[in-house]
């Protein structure tokens, strides 16, 4: 006789439901801190499972890449089309210390810049900052009508495009290779490099809407906790202070 599973005996009682466990009871909230380069350092919060056994929460937090609107970091709606990527490098208590990981424009902003009767000029440059970060910067610019121009179109010649692209490359290398990553980030916010390119190319062909539209992190140096804490203005944990006691222990010479 074949031995098999008795379905009638193995059936559970009807009406008994499994206990539903809220998954959020096993998770903790962590505060995300942006570098001091930005006006608003409180980016938001993120969830992670609590440490259990060999699975540490810090291992799942470090390396997370977050995409934040620059308008939220600066408190200005003018930067709403700019996106900043922040990478979690260190966990201190319930605070996550982040560093710059990338920069980009929204797709709708890029589409709104492209118009008829003008020439789009792009360039990309790989630079090394003074603190050994390798970055690739993507520049975009558009020709505009010259003063007293009657013709509708503003198409640049191939020789002019090559000259403008050479100017873009030289200015980006000059502005980015002699500064730290934090200083370069500060230049990206007010579009300092874009205005420099517009001034330098005025004699070749007038440009408008010149931006660093994207920054890609290619390679980073070895992690330095001291440099990260300096970027965040010191440690974020609330450390206690030493208390000076007014009394001293009395030692009895004889009992």
Swiss-Prot record:
GO BP: translation
Protein name: Small ribosomal subunit protein eS1
Name of the coding gene: RPS1
KW Metal-binding (keyword) present: no
PROSITE patterns xrefs: RIBOSOMAL_S3AE (PS01191)
Family of this protein: Belongs to the eukaryotic ribosomal protein eS1 family.
Ribonucleoprotein is among the record's keywords: yes
Taxonomic lineage: Eukaryota, Fungi, Dikarya, Ascomycota, Saccharomycotina
Subunit structure: Component of the small ribosomal subunit. Mature ribosomes consist of a small (40S) and a large (60S) subunit. The 40S subunit contains about 33 different proteins and 1 molecule of RNA (18S). The 60S subunit contains about 49 different proteins and 3 molecules of RNA (25S, 5.8S and 5S).
InterPro entries membership: Ribosomal_eS1 (IPR001593), Ribosomal_eS1_CS (IPR018281), Ribosomal_eS1_euk (IPR027500)
């Amino acid at each position: 006789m074949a031995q098999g599973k008795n379905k009638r005996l193995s059936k559970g009682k009807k009406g008994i439901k499994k206990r539903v466990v809220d998954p959020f009871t096993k998770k903790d909230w962590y505060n995300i801190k942006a570098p001091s380069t930005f006006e608003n350092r409180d980016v938001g919060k993120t969830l992670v499972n609590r440490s259990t056994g060999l699975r540490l929460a810090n291992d799942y937090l470090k390396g997370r890449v977050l995409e934040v609107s620059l308008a939220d970091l600066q408190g200005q709606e003018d930067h709403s089309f700019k996106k900043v990527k922040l990478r979690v490098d260190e966990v201190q208590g319930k605070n996550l210390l982040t560093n710059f990981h990338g920069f980009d424009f929204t797709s709708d902003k890029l589409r709104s810049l492209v118009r008829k009767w003008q020439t789009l000029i792009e360039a990309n440059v790989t630079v090394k900052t003074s603190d050994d970060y390798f970055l690739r910067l993507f520049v975009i610019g558009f020709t505009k009508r010259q003063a007293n121009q009657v013709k509708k179109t503003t198409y640049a010649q191939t020789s002019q495009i090559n000259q403008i692209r050479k100017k873009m490359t030289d200015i980006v290398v000059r502005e980015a290779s002699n500064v730290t990553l934090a200083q370069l980030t500060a230049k990206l916010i007010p579009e300092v490099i874009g205005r420099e390119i517009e001034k330098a190319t005025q004699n070749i062909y007038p440009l408008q809407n010149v931006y660093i539209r994207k920054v890609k992190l290619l390679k980073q140096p070895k992690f330095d906790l001291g440099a990260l804490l300096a970027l965040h203005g010191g440690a974020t944990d609330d450390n206690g202070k030493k208390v000076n006691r007014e009394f001293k222990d009395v030692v009895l010479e004889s009992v």
